[in-house]
Structures are given as structure tokens and as C-alpha cells.
């Protein structure tokens, strides 16, 4: 309502929600339902170029395209979803991987550090230069079908957070920001400034900027 009252000529109202679809966000709007969309970034948002744009049943013609062109003018890499889905693209992919990572550890197949080592030193670096569809297309789908038929039936299909998460939350071990500084890892004694530098380093290289000295 504040936007409606103070910005009568506004062309688009963008939410950065990672899960709410536009129709939920526009439900309380009285005037500009057709201009409300989601433009979801990934953190650190000032460095990561990707945005996922999503409209709803009320979204007006041309609104998504206007937002896409605006972001492209800022050297971002936006995509427009053909229809809403909880979690959009990025979080659906990320949490599908997270669900299986949790399953691997709970099943006794490996430890959390093993999962992270696999991600750091196997296929994740590849996907900064080519996409998943490109990768499997280039490898020949006739080979891919065997792996799909073998692995897919064994993957986790749980529909809620597992005990590995809920048990830790119950005892207060919610991660690096917890009073205990424990989650899956023990963060006591970890240099958090150095950790944050590791978080940001790939993006500095990706956009060809020099790492800051301070």
C-alpha cells in the first residue's frame, strides 16, 4: 500500500523472495497486482549475476520482459520462468542436491566432509563454465540412460526435514551462528573472515575483479 500511494508511475514491483510466488505476494495489493513479480537473486547478490524472474496469474503483459531487460543492462544474467514453482529454479536444484547429501550421510555412506570434498573437487567447478544439460548432451544420452535407471531408484525421496537437521536444532546446534558454534561441523576456532573470503573468492574470479586487500 505504501508503494501504491507513493509511486503512482512505477512500472514493476520486484520481490526478492526465494520461495513465495507472485500471486501470494500480490494478494493484498489493491492497485498494482499486475506489476508485482519475483526477481530472486543469490547471495552475495551484489556479485552473483544470476536472477530468476517469475510472474503469476495477475502479472501484466511486458512486465517480466521489462525487468529482464533492465537487469541485462546492468550486466546480470536473468531468466524468466515459464510458470511459478516453489523454490523457483536455483533452490529446487540446490535442495534436491542437499536432500541427497543428507541421505548419503544418514545412510552411513560417507561423512559431511566427504560430501563437501566431492563437490569442491569434482563436478561443481565444471558447472561454472558449462551447464548440466550441455554436459550430459555432450556425453551422449545413450550412456546417460543406464546411470539414470541405476541411480534414480536409490535416491532419497523424503518430503520433510530429516532427523539430521531437526535433532541438531532441538539441542541448539544450529550452525556457525549458534551459541555452541556447532552444526554438522564444529565452528569453534574457525577464522570467519577467512571463511567469508573463501565464500566470495569464486565470484571475484568469475567477474574478473581483483580480490580486495581488506
Could you describe each region identified by the protein language model?
Residues 1-12:
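Rossmann-like NAD(P)-binding element
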Residues 12-83, 87, 91:
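Rossmann-fold dinucleotide-binding core
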Residues 21, 97, 143:
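Short phosphate-engaging motifs
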Residues 49-50, 97-101, 146-151:
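A general alpha-helix detector
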Residues 70, 103-104:
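Residues within well-ordered alpha helices
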Amino acid at each position: 500500500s505504501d508503494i501504491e500511494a507513493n509511486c503512482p508511475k512505477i512500472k514493476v514491483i520486484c520481490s526478492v523472495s526465494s520461495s513465495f510466488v507472485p500471486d501470494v505476494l500480490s494478494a493484498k495489493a489493491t492497485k498494482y497486482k499486475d506489476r508485482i513479480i519475483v526477481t530472486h537473486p543469490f547471495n552475495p547478490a551484489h556479485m552473483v549475476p544470476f536472477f530468476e524472474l517469475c510472474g503469476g496469474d495477475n502479472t501484466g503483459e511486458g512486465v517480466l520482459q521489462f525487468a529482464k531487460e533492465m537487469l541485462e543492462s546492468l550486466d546480470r544474467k536473468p531468466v524468466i520462468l515459464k510458470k511459478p514453482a516453489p523454490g523457483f529454479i536455483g533452490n529446487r536444484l540446490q535442495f534436491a542436491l542437499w536432500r541427497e547429501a543428507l541421505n548419503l550421510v544418514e545412510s552411513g555412506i560417507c561423512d559431511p566432509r566427504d560430501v563437501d570434498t566431492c563437490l569442491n573437487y569434482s563436478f561443481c567447478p565444471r558447472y561454472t563454465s558449462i551447464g548440466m544439460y550441455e554436459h550430459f548432451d555432450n556425453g551422449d544420452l545413450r550412456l546417460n540412460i543406464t546411470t539414470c535407471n541405476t541411480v534414480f531408484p536409490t535416491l532419497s525421496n523424503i518430503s520433510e526435514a530429516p532427523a539430521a537437521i531437526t535433532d541438531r536444532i532441538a539441542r541448539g546446534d544450529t550452525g556457525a551462528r549458534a551459541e555452541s558454534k556447532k552444526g554438522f561441523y564444529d565452528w569453534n576456532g574457525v577464522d570467519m573472515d577467512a571463511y567469508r573470503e573463501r565464500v566470495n573468492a569464486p565470484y571475484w574470479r568469475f567477474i574478473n575483479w581483483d580480490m580486495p586487500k581488506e
